[in-house]
Amino acid sequence: MSTLQHKTSSARRSSRRSVAAPDFVAVSRIPIVEVSPQLLDGTAPVKSTVDESFPVQATIFREGHDKFAARAVLVDGAGHTVDSVPMCDVSPGLFRFEGWLTPRVPGPHRFFVEAWSDPYATWLHNAEIKVPAGIDVGLVFAEAEVLFKAALKGTPVRSGERAAIRDALTVISKRRALPEVKLAAARSEEVRAAFAAYPVKELVSRSREYPVFVDRVRALVGSWYELFPRSVGATRDSESGEWTSGTLRTAATDLDRVAGMGFDVVYIPPVHPIGLTNRKGRNNSLTAVPGDPGSPYAIGSDAAGGHDAIEPSLGTFEDFDVFVGRAHELGMEVALDLALQCSPDHPWVKEHPEWFTARPDGTIAYAENPPKKYQDIYPLNFDNDPEGIYKEIKRVVELWVAHGVTIFRVDNPHTKPVGFWQRLLAEFRVEHPEVIFLAEAFTNPPMMQTLGTVGFHQSYTYFTWRNERQEIEEYLMEVSHESSHRMRPAFWPTTHDILTPYIQRGGISAAAIRAILAATGSPTWGIYNGYELIENIARPGAEEHIDNEKYEFKPRNYALAEQNGMATLLTMLNSIRSKHKALQRLRNVTINPTSNDKIVSFTKVARPEETADGVMDAVIVVVNLDPYASRDATVYLDLSPFGISPRWDGGPIIEVTDEMSGETYLWNEAPYVHLDPHGQVAHVLSVKVLS
């Protein structure tokens, strides 16, 4: 061998030795792959709430023809098993298995999938073929004796399951018993149930564990009502035209009305001091006149303070405590707007100029979302002093928690670093697990989804702009299935920022349609005050209310809401929601096709393990989407939630009661509906399956 050949050969051997074997995860004896749900490769917790079932899926298979079984298992933070359910093949041929787990207490949990070789199922499959054919009958029952004796060791003494297996074993062991008698004993319903409850397991395999965080129920279910405290009780002098602001105490007097409509969360915009520099006037004008209160989102003043202070015209912390206390007395929680931005007058601007972005000319950059400009707001720069900003914001949030705030509606979280939220929400999950954060993030789907992944409990959604049947159907399926493990939706027909063309043009009927869809389509929904007065006039060229409350006082006469019936409808919807667990659930939604593109229908279900009486609760919703004209349609019911099939003669299979009108109907699988936007625009139907 030449010197060159020797060097080349040595180099090749050295190269082979230096290449490390690739990392891999060993496949278990019974392969368990593609486990869901999981987030960030199983490092971030998926979402659930107390008594809310969630589905676990996995692809499970094995070599050969022997049978296997699987269970989904939920363990609490201490490692104790709190739920364990069999998994069923939901995609025959694809070996996709599913089981629904139901946590009962809040806090960190983990789930895993366990699979095993099932000798009883394998034996039974073989026996049902061999015994009738007279093949190896003696051997078949000899195997059964061994199997049933092993099963006896795993069943509790004096249990019904043990008795069933023992009795079957007695028959199987009789030498003179007929083979068909032995087989009948071995496959009786009692024996099958015993092996299901206490299976004989071989080749037990487990997936890795995946984290779940179980929140309190309000993280999933809530009826929100937004009001501006400064508008409630605001008065205007008839001679001078000067306004006197409403206060937190006058706003507290309005809470009885809100609670009377069935709302359980009262949401208020920022109550902090409002800056004077570049203060916005009415309808977002650049010039404010004396008496204009400014935008509550331009937070901070030299004299009164910043995020840890209260706008003097609203009152004091004592007044805030009165407001919160009254809300709690009425069974409502208070959600406070958390807007991480500053007016030019905010104390942080002078104390921490590094927390803002400086332009080349030395001025501070104000907020922009081209073509929109917010000259009265400075956005924070989270990169210059991230630790300093983090500590201060956490201090501020904890201050308001100490004053009884349990929910924060976070303004534009998508304009702040995701890592900031991940840290803040993780620490609050440990230190203040009762506190809920809603993301007001009308932004791109990846950002919305990731904000949910890192810990936001709820999110505003695109529901506001989903008006057509197909849009609504697709969006309901998206939020209830595809994204339910990471993002909980909140459906709002309008907000103080958004007034859609559909609401602008459709009048009372449009408002009713959207309220019904919001209240039934999502466990959390919300109404911005004035909705019950049909405030639907937009500022020209904008999708927001004219004379917007963000820039002026807006006292209202709510007696008018009784005349148009909207307050009655909102009250009815909240009452129906409180009565039906199905409307308090997100994941079990199915679409019912209809023969009319202007009529949408869907079914929502609460599983038996989610209800107090252990009986499935189901609601069918049918809505006319046309605010101008009556529509009729045939509704083609998806019967899978009820586990029933159509009758051979087309006769009725369910009894439905309209929770809005009180009328009861007998329906087959394809009922006819007629809905009038000026009368009954929708059906919200409870369901009873006919025997």
From Swiss-Prot:
Transmembrane segments: none annotated. SUPFAM superfamilies: (Trans)glycosidases. Maltosyltransferase that uses maltose 1-phosphate (M1P) as the sugar donor to elongate linear or branched alpha-(1->4)-glucans. Is involved in a branched alpha-glucan biosynthetic pathway from trehalose, together with TreS, Mak and GlgB. It is an enzyme of class 2 (transferase). It holds the Pfam family GlgE_dom_N_S. InterPro entries: GlgE (IPR026585), GLGE_C (IPR049171), GlgE_dom_N/S (IPR021828), Glyco_hydro_13_cat_dom (IPR006047), Glyco_hydro_b (IPR013780), Glycoside_hydrolase_SF (IPR017853), Ig-like_fold (IPR013783). One of its GO terms (biological process) is alpha-glucan biosynthetic process. The keyword Metal-binding does not apply. The active site is at D411, E440. This is Alpha-1,4-glucan:maltose-1-phosphate maltosyltransferase. Its EC number is 2.4.99.16. Keywords: Carbohydrate metabolism, Glycosyltransferase, Transferase. GO terms for molecular function: hexosyltransferase activity; hydrolase activity, hydrolyzing O-glycosyl compounds. Belongs to the glycosyl hydrolase 13 family. GlgE subfamily. It catalyses: alpha-maltose 1-phosphate + [(1->4)-alpha-D-glucosyl](n) = [(1->4)-alpha-D-glucosyl](n+2) + phosphate. Alpha-maltose 1-phosphate binds at K280, Q341, D376, N412, K550, Y551. The record marks D497 as: Transition state stabilizer. Homodimer.
